[in-house]
């Protein structure tokens, strides 16, 4: 029962009352003197995966926090099972499937937060080091890979100059195609995440805090000075925003001179912490992606390979990729150029992407000094335009060949045409194997159409080769290239179902007997109607671009293509 003190005038004893034998009212034994200068300790902090306001980026940050705690545990107690309580100075952290709990150990939160951030965000030899992104006990990446991963963070989370401090430029030497190359990267002495615990502490004390653009790359305040449009974070949200640097995977976008990051929202924090180190690119060429679609599928594929494709849904929920690039109206910072979000991971989509990525890998190329300069050679990562096209279709749940007839690169080059010095083609000779690798992922009717076009092409080119057998090689080559160009323009220029049918009929009639066409005419006919004529046009150009000849005419075509490809690679 609570002590009750006398109220009103009765609470002030009269001097005569003591003389009359009345005692002064006793002070309540439960009452304690309160020091107004001493702050009460905040309650333990709990981060819940499905709490209101937890966006995919913040959920990815919760996964990054779990991965960092696992790295700290592995460093301090290698034999401890995961998940076990993680000691952070006076406090501890505990990871559950859908929550992370931080206890301050009876001390001010500052000591616990300092220990957590100090062990999670480091700089080694000028390069950013995030232990949560590496397997426990794994050796450090080679210098050229560490520099590339460092640069990927610079063009995503740490692009603003105020987010980093100090540091000298680092020179790294390694070999590409048995030739020494040198790459320079700006090193850092520190970066903003190392002291961001102060913002979390502010949120614990006053209820919320504001974070700069490094917490949400590519985002901006809609109306500067209008408070209702300003993003504010609770303590749990701020902590997740800080560790999004670990939970997300950052890539470089060489073609756009920008970057991309993928926020993988976990459904199981314990399991995600085990899988996160496997998402970090292990090869230099894998640090680059062709776009946001390539980034989201690349991250999902690696996660599926680590967890198993059939079990991926038990670990991963929403996946969101953001491509950042410079825009004409903002030269200082890269802003969002594309966002790709997938709420479900389809196994058949990952199978198709895996085939495309294997056949069309990014490649390292030596960049020679321009003109007569005698400087040192550097390198660049060459990105396949065809891979970018295929991955955009796959990420959008479209057939991988959709709009092959009309798709262009950012420079206005056509995806369906082979590149040469004097044309607007984008394909390179070696990318033909990428088209061939995707043939098994066509429907039955689509495959019959492609094969019927291949047979017709073989007949036409064989006839041209026979007609020019006694002619000069240049004459034969020009005839073969001219026929292929005529067919390409005929298919690409078709704008109606009638024009598509006319272009195909012209090819088939010139080629003579076509066994595939005769046996599967009813199947092919489905593609020539008003509903699917665009698909037929795309597939005809896929067949033309993926055609591999036999005998002499194959050599002529390949020589011409290799000459064009060599001019692009040099």
Curated annotation (Swiss-Prot):
Biological processes annotated in GO: defense response to virus; sporulation resulting in formation of a cellular spore
Family recorded in the similarity comment: Belongs to the CRISPR-associated protein Cas8a1/Csx13 family. Myxan subtype subfamily.
Phenotypic consequence of gene deletion: Decreases sporulation 1000 to 10000-fold, aggregation is delayed. Delays for C-signal-dependent methylation of FrczCD and impairs fruA transcription. This mutant should not have polar effects on downstream genes.
Organism of provenance: Myxococcus xanthus (strain DK1622)
Region (Disordered): 1-23, 551-570
Protein name: CRISPR-associated protein Cas8a1/Csx13
Keyword Ribonucleoprotein: no
Job of this protein: CRISPR (clustered regularly interspaced short palindromic repeat) is an adaptive immune system that provides protection against mobile genetic elements (viruses, transposable elements and conjugative plasmids). CRISPR clusters contain spacers, sequences complementary to antecedent mobile elements, and target invading nucleic acids. CRISPR clusters are transcribed and processed into CRISPR RNA (crRNA).
Induction: Part of an operon going from at least MXAN_7266 to MXAN_7259 that includes a CRISPR operon with transcription continuing into the pre-crRNA locus.
InterPro entries: CRISPR-assoc_Csx13_C (IPR027811), CRISPR-assoc_Csx13_N (IPR019989)
Keyword match DNA repair: no
């Amino acid at each position: 029962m609570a002590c009750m003190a006398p109220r009103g005038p009765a609470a002030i004893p009269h001097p005569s009352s003591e003389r009359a034998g009345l005692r002064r009212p006793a002070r309540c034994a439960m009452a304690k003197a309160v020091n107004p200068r001493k702050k009460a300790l905040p309650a333990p902090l709990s981060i819940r995966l499905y709490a209101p306001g937890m966006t995919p980026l913040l959920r990815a940050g919760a996964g990054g926090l779990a991965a960092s705690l696992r790295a700290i545990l592995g460093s301090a107690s290698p034999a401890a099972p995961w998940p076990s309580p993680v000691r952070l100075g006076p406090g501890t952290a505990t990871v559950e499937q859908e929550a992370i709990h931080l206890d301050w150990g009876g001390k001010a939160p500052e000591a616990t937060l300092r220990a957590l951030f100090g062990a999670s965000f480091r700089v080694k030899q000028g390069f950013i080091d995030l232990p949560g992104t590496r397997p426990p006990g794994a050796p450090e990446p080679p210098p050229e890979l560490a520099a590339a991963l460092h640069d990927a963070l610079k063009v995503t989370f740490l692009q603003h100059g105020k987010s980093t401090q100090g540091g000298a430029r680092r020179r790294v030497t390694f070999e590409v195609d048995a030739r020494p190359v040198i790459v320079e990267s700006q090193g850092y002495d520190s970066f903003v995440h190392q002291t961001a615990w102060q913002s979390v502490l502010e949120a614990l004390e006053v209820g919320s805090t504001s974070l700069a653009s490094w917490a949400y790359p590519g985002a901006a305040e809609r109306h500067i000075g209008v408070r209702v449009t300003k993003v504010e974070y609770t303590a749990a949200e701020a902590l997740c925003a800080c560790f999004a640097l670990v939970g997300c995977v950052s890539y470089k976008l060489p073609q756009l001179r920008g970057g991309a990051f993928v926020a993988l929202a976990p459904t199981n924090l314990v399991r995600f912490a085990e899988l996160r180190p496997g998402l970090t690119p292990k090869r230099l060429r894998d640090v680059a992606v062709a776009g946001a679609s390539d980034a989201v599928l690349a991250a999902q594929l690696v996660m599926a390979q680590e967890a198993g494709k059939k079990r991926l849904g038990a670990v991963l929920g929403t996946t969101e990729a953001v491509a950042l690039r410079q825009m004409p109206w903002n030269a200082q910072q890269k802003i969002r150029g594309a966002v790709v979000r997938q709420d479900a991971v389809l196994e058949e989509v990952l199978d198709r992407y895996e085939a495309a990525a294997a056949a069309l890998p990014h490649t390292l190329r030596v960049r020679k000094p321009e003109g007569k300069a005698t400087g040192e050679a550097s390198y660049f990562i060459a990105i396949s335009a065809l891979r970018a096209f295929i991955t955009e279709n796959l990420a959008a749940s479209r057939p991988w060949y959709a709009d092959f007839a009309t798709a262009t690169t950012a420079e206005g080059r056509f995806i369906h045409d082979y590149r040469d010095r004097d044309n607007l083609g984008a394909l390179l000779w070696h990318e033909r194997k990428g088209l061939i690798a995707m043939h098994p992922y066509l429907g039955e009717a689509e495959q019959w159409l492609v094969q019927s076009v291949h047979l017709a092409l073989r007949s036409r080119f064989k006839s041209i080769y026979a007609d020019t057998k006694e002619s000069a090689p240049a004459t034969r080559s020009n005839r073969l290239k001219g026929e292929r160009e005529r067919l390409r323009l005929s298919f690409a220029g078709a704008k109606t179902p009638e024009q598509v049918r006319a272009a195909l009929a012209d090819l088939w009639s010139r080629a003579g007997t076509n066994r595939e066409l005769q046996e599967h005419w009813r199947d092919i006919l489905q593609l020539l109607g008003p509903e699917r004529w665009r698909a037929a046009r795309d597939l005809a150009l896929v067949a033309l671009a993926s055609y591999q000849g036999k005998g002499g005419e194959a050599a002529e075509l390949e020589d011409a293509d290799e000459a064009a490809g060599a001019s692009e690679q040099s």
